[in-house]
């Protein structure tokens, strides 16, 4: 618009210059033509000048309106931007504040939970320690009971073993009776054969001798089985009585003696018993002190249990001494060398195995009849079994 205003000014100034020039015009044209052209130019100039003024007014109005609109638009834009920014800032601030509050709450809850967990863990540890201490006592009691049970088996096992041994002894006694009956029947048949037919006497003698040798072998085997069972039963009862006596004495002097030494003596004595197929061996050693030396006991009066044990040992020894040798067709059967000695002083019993057929001449044919061995009476075996049961 300034350029247009300047153009208008230039036009007006140019018009003024033309007016100055037209003061003293030189009449080129003549007469009416010059006047008409001059009048047309003046009217055109006036018209153009009026248009320029109108356009300048419109221009100024438009400029004002544009400035007003620009200011209005800028104010509106500032208001919009300021309101949006404030709202966003407010929202962000509120969100940050809420997050901070949540963080503080969670932190306080976490601290509280950690504190509760530490306290509960401490309480649980104390309870666990107390329970472990409570469990240690019954565990030690159970272990001691197991050790005592291993050292001293229950009486029910001994009773079962004794019953089984009694049944075996009864069966062997019945077999022995049957063998005796067969032997007597064979003797009767032999006498009848001698009276009836002297020609067949030799054949019958050989057959009878073979039968008698077999029957005597079976009878002797049954006798030695019975003897072995009796000796094993006697030895088991003796060891049990000794163990019970030691337990009684150990409980009586429990405060004066250490329990470890007593248990070791019982374990050592219980391990010295060996029951085998044909022999039974028991060896007792003197107790060992904690220093490794054998303890010396002063002479004292024997207990009632010892008197019973010695009396039964004397009975069994006399019985075995009477049965040391079994005559068989003129030959004597020699037992084990350690069987005849006095074994009550050194506390060791060794029973020999039954004789074999190769050691004695059972299969030889002889003209003489075989005498029966001197077997112990049955009432003595019953009495010995009763004594063992009473002792147990």
From Swiss-Prot:
Post-translational modification: Ubiquitinated via 'Lys-48'-linked polyubiquitination by TRIM38, leading to its degradation.
Region of interest: Homodimerization: 1-197
Disordered: region residues: 345-365
Keyword annotations: Coiled coil, Cytoplasm, Phosphoprotein, Ubl conjugation
Record-linked InterPro entries: TBD (IPR024581), TBK1-IKBKE_adapters (IPR051891)
Chain residue ranges for the region called Interaction with TBK1 and IKBKE: 216-257
Functional summary from the UniProt entry: Adapter protein which binds TBK1 and IKBKE playing a role in antiviral innate immunity. Activates serine/threonine-protein kinase TBK1 and facilitates its oligomerization. Enhances the phosphorylation of NF-kappa-B p65 subunit RELA by TBK1. Promotes TBK1-induced as well as TNF-alpha or PMA-induced activation of NF-kappa-B. Participates in IFNB promoter activation via TICAM1.
Official protein name in the record: 5-azacytidine-induced protein 2
Organism name: Pongo abelii (Sumatran orangutan)
């Amino acid at each position: 618009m300034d350029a247009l205003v300047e153009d208008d000014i230039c036009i007006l100034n140019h018009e003024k210059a033309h007016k100055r020039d037209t003061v003293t015009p030189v009449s080129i044209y003549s007469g009416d033509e010059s006047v008409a052209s001059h009048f047309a130019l003046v009217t055109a100039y006036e018209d153009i000048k009026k248009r320029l003024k109108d356009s300048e007014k419109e221009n100024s109005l438009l400029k004002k309106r544009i400035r007003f609109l620009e200011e209005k638009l800028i104010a509106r834009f500032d208001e919009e931007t300021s309101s949006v920014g404030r709202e966003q800032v407010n929202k962000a601030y509120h969100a940050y504040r809420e997050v901070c509050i949540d963080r503080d709450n969670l932190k306080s809850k976490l601290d509280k939970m950690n504190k509760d967990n530490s306290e509960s863990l401490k309480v649980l540890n104390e309870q666990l320690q107390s329970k472990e201490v409570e469990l240690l006592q019954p565990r030690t009691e159970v272990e001691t009971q197991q050790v005592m049970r291993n050292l001293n088996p229950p009486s029910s096992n001994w009773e079962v073993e004794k019953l089984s041994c009694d049944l075996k002894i009864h069966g062997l006694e019945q077999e022995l009776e049957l063998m005796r009956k067969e032997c007597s029947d064979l003797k009767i048949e032999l006498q009848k054969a001698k009276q009836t037919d002297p020609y067949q006497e030799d054949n019958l003698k050989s057959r009878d001798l073979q039968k008698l040798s077999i029957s005597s072998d079976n009878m002797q085997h049954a006798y030695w089985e019975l003897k072995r069972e009796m000796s094993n039963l006697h030895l088991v009862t003796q060891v049990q009585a000794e163990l019970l006596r030691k337990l009684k004495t150990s409980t009586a002097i429990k405060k004066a003696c250490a329990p470890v030494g007593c248990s070791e003596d019982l374990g050592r004595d219980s391990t010295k018993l060996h029951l085998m197929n044909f022999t039974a061996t028991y060896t007792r050693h003197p107790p060992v002190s904690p220093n490794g030396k054998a303890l010396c006991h002063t002479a004292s009066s024997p207990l009632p249990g010892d008197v019973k044990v010695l009396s039964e040992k004397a009975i069994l020894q006399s019985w075995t001494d009477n049965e040391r040798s079994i005559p068989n067709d003129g030959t004597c059967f020699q037992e084990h060398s350690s069987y005849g000695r006095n074994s009550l002083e050194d506390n060791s019993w060794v029973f020999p195995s039954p004789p074999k057929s190769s050691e004695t001449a059972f299969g030889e044919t002889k003209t003489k009849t075989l005498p029966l061995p001197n077997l112990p009476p049955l009432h003595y075996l019953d009495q010995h079994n009763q004594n063992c049961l009473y002792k147990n």
